[in-house]
Amino acid sequence: MAAGAIALILAILCYFLFSTAHAHEAQSRSKVSPLKEGDTIGVLAPAAKGNMAEYTEAIDLLESLGYQVKLAPSVHKSAGYLAGSDEDRAKDINDFFQDDEVKAILCLRGGYGSARILPLLDYDAIAKHPKLFIGFSDITALHTALGEKAHMVTIHGPMLSSFKNFDYTAFTLYLFENGLSGSYPIGKLPMPEGTSLTTLVPGSATGLLEGGNLTVLASLCGTPYELKGDGAILFLEDVRVSPYEIDRLMEQLYQNGLLSRVSGIVYGDFGRAQAGAAEGDFSVDDIMTHYAKQAGKPAVKNFPIGHAANNLFLPLGIQATLQANEDGTATITLNESYLKSN
């Protein structure tokens, strides 16, 4: 074989090896450490304000699990409907990630405001101090930015507000408690008793778990913080949205290309979305199935995440497999831990 041909083959081989390694590196996320008894959980308010007098029972619950609680200044602040200025709320996040005393960060509540602080976060500094970061709803903006910019695993799960009125199930508390301590089961994700995942579009997919609140993800499209989602298993939830609003938001994700980039779609709780729909209107299931089929992706529904009493402690940025069977049954399996190796 001519020397030129050999050189060309070697060059092509090196290119593919580099590309594969680069793609793997791009997908890898920094993992986090579990909590030990006596560790400190930092509570901050990156979005809407809250009345801390309403959170006494929730703080007592964290302390009953064996943890200390440190409150960020933002939980006591107010600026319109926000928990202080954008600068104040961003500073709390930057400070807590670099505070060695704080071993995990729990968001107070959602609402609105997380997207406003994304340009103010020090992603390089945060990336050097990965730790459990937990929340959902509006916190989706932070999960997405921390995954894309700081390349770290985060947790889509209950916030302090989830525990303030005892409006949660034993399922939610059990997985939250075991998720914090590192006893969370790896393998097939559990479902609340009497419930099951249901196939909308059969098929299988493997990729990073990513996603969150549908409204927030759609609002990030076209910004520097939008979810890339290449090969991901995308999960979605929302609350107080009608079927036509879900349709509009899903169309935005479709036209953005996100639904084409992911490998599978998982629908969580959509909070009574069908209420008020007129006879003959598309159902939520119709809309969910339409977009999954249009994108050519396997899809399931009834995933226990979102604004409901059952809310999984779900690691984002780790490999998982979605299996949606022809008989209507389905499973989601975590293929790796969200925790650092010892």
Regions found by a protein language model. Give the residues of each.
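Internal helical hairpin/lid segments
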Residues: 225-284
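Bacterial N-terminal signal peptides
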Residues: 5-17
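A short helix->loop->beta-strand "cap" motif at the edges of active sites that frequently abuts
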Residues: 101, 127-132, 152, 262-263, ...
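Short, acidic/small-residue loops that bind anionic groups at enzyme active sites
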Residues: 123-145, 153-159
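ATP/nucleoside-binding phosphotransfer catalytic cores, i.e., glycine-rich phosphate-binding loops
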Residues: 269-342
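Conserved anion/nucleotide-ligand pocket segment
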Residues: 152-216
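ATP/NTP phosphate-donor binding region
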Residues: 24-101
